[in-house]
């Protein structure tokens, strides 16, 4: 089985490399240390619901496409820098990685496989599976997404569905975004800065 990349994802395989991995990370911080074996079982269950993630990226005659492969997604303890390279041309490997470190469950994914919404739903499913397996005595309820996602939704080309060149551009001058100052790091050097902010204070601004 194979499926084409959506329009927004077509450029990612062409521009990715060791200096720009096109990988993003979502994570969940628990109140307890993560058990790797239980997390693996939770991932196995999640893959049954998200079989489209069990794919490798292949290059066709004219375009890239995703090909289903019977590769097991394996949980790893975090050792690599965040958002390390996942897609390497001619290497038949899955385009995401689940890892853990102390209390944190990480989900990293190559952007051509899914967008932020798909990644968020997958991580929610993964963490829910983990908590149910880790605490059977609590009889935790299984919570389904408010909007049930079908296989068709997971394959949806949102770019084609919602983008239109006919919509007039907004000529109203908007306030410029905040620009970070200082010396830039090279892409291969990634530093993680964690900040805790008050939502109330942000809303007041």
Enumerate the predicted regions with their spans.
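Non-catalytic N-terminal regions of enzymes
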Residues: 1-160, 189-191, 196, 202-204
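A short acidic-Thr-Gly-centered motif at the start of a beta-strand
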Residues: 96-101, 164-179
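Short Lys/Arg-rich basic patches
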Residues: 179-193
């Amino acid at each position: 089985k194979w499926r084409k990349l959506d329009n927004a994802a077509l450029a990612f395989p062409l521009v990715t490399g060791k200096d720009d991995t096109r990988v993003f990370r979502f994570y969940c911080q628990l109140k307890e240390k993560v058990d790797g074996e239980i997390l693996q079982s939770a991932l196995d269950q999640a893959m049954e619901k998200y079989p489209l993630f069990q794919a490798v990226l292949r290059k066709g005659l004219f375009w890239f496409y995703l090909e289903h492969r019977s590769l097991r997604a394996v949980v790893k303890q975090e050792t690599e820098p965040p958002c390390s390279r996942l897609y390497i041309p001619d290497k038949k490997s899955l385009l995401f990685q689940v890892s853990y470190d102390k209390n944190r469950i990480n989900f990293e994914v190559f952007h051509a496989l899914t967008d932020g919404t798909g990644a968020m739903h997958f991580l929610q499913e993964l963490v829910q599976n983990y908590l149910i397996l880790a605490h059977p005595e609590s009889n935790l309820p299984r919570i389904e997404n408010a909007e049930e996602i079908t296989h068709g939704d997971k394959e949806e080309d949102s770019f084609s569905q919602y983008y239109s060149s006919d919509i007039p551009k907004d000529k109203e001058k908007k306030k410029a975004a905040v620009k970070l100052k200082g010396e830039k790091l090279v892409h291969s050097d990634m530093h993680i800065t964690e900040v805790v902010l008050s939502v109330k204070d942000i809303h007041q601004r």
